[in-house]
UniProtKB/Swiss-Prot annotation:
Protein name per Swiss-Prot or TrEMBL: Hydrazine synthase subunit gamma
Residues the record lists as binding Ca(2+) 2: N129, S306, G307, T308
Domain Cytochrome c: 209-353
Provenance organism: Kuenenia stuttgartiensis
Stated induction or repression of this protein's expression: Is among the most highly expressed proteins in the proteome.
Cofactor annotation remark: Binds two heme c groups per subunit. Heme 1 appears to be in the active site, whereas heme 2 probably functions in electron transfer.
Names of required cofactors: heme c
Residues of the signal peptide: 1-39
EC numbers for this chain: 1.7.2.7
Pathway: Nitrogen metabolism
Length: 353
């Protein structure tokens, strides 16, 4: 099944709306005729492959990059649409007072600043780590909580992107919603972002000796990494995720109640008094991520470049994700019995993915 976005007739863009600088930036000079951009008969400018309602794969089925997940077929405008999406991704004009763009957080073509944000969309105090979105089209859902499923939910008026980045002064302060064309172009650009590949392997792509030792630890059933992150490091299509949500001990509401080190919550009275609004520790959960214990299993591809880690950015380094200093003991892999050198070898293997 394919959904086609067409421009033409009543939907075509008039030349008076398009600024010369934007046209030049998009590389679409020459596509403009006397009637408008893409004037004349409707033309297919994007074809997105869709299917039945997306369902998480079973753990016995390693998740891999689909052979054909997204493609623009028989379209002379693919590159222009992606480049227009890149313009939108880096353009702050659509936000309130031009304060920031997508690239402000997902900089350098979809990578992450590693910063943690409290955007207030799920209750003050719901810290969220900036997600690494390269290769994101291969691995829904698109939020830490796993609330969105099908890859194409990210497209459309009720999509996760339009909802998460919607016309809401409590989130990214966008002054208006994206038009269908702008949203489609943005999605095409995001879908075009591929994994970078690890620079930590040998020159021929093979694993170093430390990485080989780390692989044995990673695949050891006693450690359990493969239970949630299945994949072969020599398979370029492997994603190292079971596409499920799990409780790895990072939620504030733990198995036996509150965690021993609950986070700081927003205090409006302190803010009004000119004090640090997050200066007070509290055992009282609030709406949003504080009431969630299970979070989406991320891909381990490009994991070296996607820190900080966990949904709240609680782990600054890869070592912090496995040495039981951030999450509850042995809830994120069973690593408490490993020696320091074994932990370091495991980190080296992760950096190779």
């Amino acid at each position: 099944m394919a959904r086609e976005m067409r421009l033409g007739g009543k939907e075509r863009m008039k030349t008076g709306v398009v600024k010369i600088g934007l046209v030049a930036a998009l590389g679409v000079v020459g596509l403009i005729s006397a009637g408008g951009v893409y004037a004349g008969q409707p033309r297919v400018i994007s074809t997105i492959q869709t299917g039945a309602t997306w369902e998480p794969l079973g753990r016995e089925e390693p998740l891999t990059v689909p052979e054909v997940h997204f493609r623009v077929k028989h379209s002379p405008f693919k590159s222009e649409l992606v480049r227009y999406g890149q313009f939108q991704f880096n353009d702050a004009a659509w936000s309130l007072q031009g304060s920031y763009s997508c690239a402000s957080c997902h900089y350098e073509r979809g990578q992450t600043t590693g910063l943690i944000w409290d955007l207030g969309d799920e209750g003050w105090g719901s810290w969220k780590n900036t997600k690494y979105i390269r290769g994101g089209r291969y691995l829904p859902p698109f939020r830490h909580e796993g609330f969105t499923g099908h890859p194409d939910e990210i497209v459309g008026a009720t999509s996760s992107l339009d909802r998460v980045c919607g016309r809401d002064p409590g989130f990214v302060f966008r002054s208006e919603n994206f038009s269908p064309m702008r949203l489609e172009a943005l999605i095409c650009y995001i879908r075009a972002l591929e994994f970078t590949g690890s620079p930590f392997r040998n020159a021929d792509g093979s694993l170093t000796e430390a990485q080989k030792r780390g692989q044995k630890i990673f695949e050891d059933p006693k450690v359990g990494c493969l239970e949630c992150h299945p994949g072969d490091p020599m398979d370029p299509r492997a994603l190292f995720s079971d596409a499920q949500t799990h409780d790895v001990g990072t939620g504030r509401v733990g198995v036996n109640g509150f965690r021993s080190t609950p986070g700081k919550v927003f205090n409006i009275s302190a803010l009004e008094a000119g004090e640090d609004p997050y200066g007070v520790e509290s055992n009282t959960p609030i709406i949003g991520l504080d009431l969630v214990k299970e979070f989406d299993t991320p891909t381990l591809r490009d994991i070296y470049a996607s820190g900080t880690y966990f949904h709240d950015g609680g782990a600054r380094t890869l070592m912090d994700t496995i040495n039981n200093t951030v999450n509850d003991k042995d809830m994120h892999g069973r690593t408490s019995h490993l020696k320091q050198q074994e932990l370091q070898d495991l980190v080296e293997y992760l950096k190779a993915l």
